[in-house]
């Protein structure tokens, strides 16, 4: 049974659209021009490529980082991006229910007010057994520790993995896989950054949940009712007298 969550007031359409556009451009610049950003982009692009190439269906959607094609290599012919090909309010996306076979969300949740509603909308438009791949900056990391010193993160809400997994479970998403990326402090100088790359090997082995970013692969779990065969019904009917006897005995 699907659980319900407490609803909150939503921001206006203009606020949500403007916020996503502004942070998406900033994020792209940070990923391309900083040592930490370049490392994360390289690792996440590889992860996306490995996990979209075996996806099939009619429609795929990329939300965020629209200048970087992260759907490259998959077998789906019809691709959409937000906000490049279309302009969408992520709380009310202009797609039919259960129409998307693959959705990727590179660092979207951190920059959206009340991202819980976005998760609900993603669940609505995702086809049964469809796949979502999302990446998020981890609050329990170097990025979370120094978020007040990184301009990109000052207005962001870095994600707690445990809380996100709980929210996904409430929405009936199944987690099919995931990965952690980058354990280096966010140095501005490439030379300093290279000196601490050994933390990546140590982090993967000893403290993976403290990575600067993480990825999750989600599946839309659909419960299919099991039909009872006639022979099973006959077997069930033979139990009725004993069940009736049990009810009578309980009255005494």
Predicted regions and their residues:
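Class I SAM-dependent methyltransferase SAM/SAH-binding core
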Residues: 46-96
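Hydrophobic beta-strand segment of the Class I
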Residues: 103-104
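Conserved catalytic loop of SAM-dependent methyltransferase domains
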Residues: 175-201, 209-211
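Short alpha-helix
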Residues: 155-178, 182
């Amino acid at each position: 049974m699907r659980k319900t969550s407490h609803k909150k007031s939503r921001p206006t359409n203009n606020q949500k659209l403007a916020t996503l556009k502004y942070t998406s451009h900033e994020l792209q610049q940070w990923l391309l021009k900083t040592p930490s950003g370049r490392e994360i982009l390289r690792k996440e692009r590889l992860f996306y490529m490995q996990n979209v190439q075996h996806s099939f269906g009619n429609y795929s959607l990329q939300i965020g980082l629209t200048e970087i094609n992260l759907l490259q290599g998959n077998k789906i012919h019809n691709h959409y991006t937000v906000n490049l090909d279309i302009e969408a309010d992520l709380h009310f996306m202009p797609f039919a229910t259960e129409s998307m076979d693959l959705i990727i969300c590179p660092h979207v949740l951190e920059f959206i007010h009340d991202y819980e509603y976005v998760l609900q909308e993603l669940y609505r438009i995702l086809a049964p057994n469809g796949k979502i791949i999302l990446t998020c900056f981890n609050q329990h990391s170097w990025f979370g520790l120094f978020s007040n010193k990184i301009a990109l993160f000052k207005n962001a809400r870095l994600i707690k993995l445990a809380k996100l997994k709980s929210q996904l479970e409430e929405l009936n998403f199944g987690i099919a896989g995931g990965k952690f990326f980058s354990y280096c402090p966010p140095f501005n100088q490439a030379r300093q950054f290279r000196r601490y790359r050994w933390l990546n090997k140590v982090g993967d082995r000893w403290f993976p949940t403290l990575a600067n970013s993480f990825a999750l692969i989600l599946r839309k779990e659909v419960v299919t009712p099991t039909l009872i065969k006639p022979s099973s019904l006959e077997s069930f009917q033979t139990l009725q007298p004993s069940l009736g006897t049990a009810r009578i005995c309980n009255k005494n």
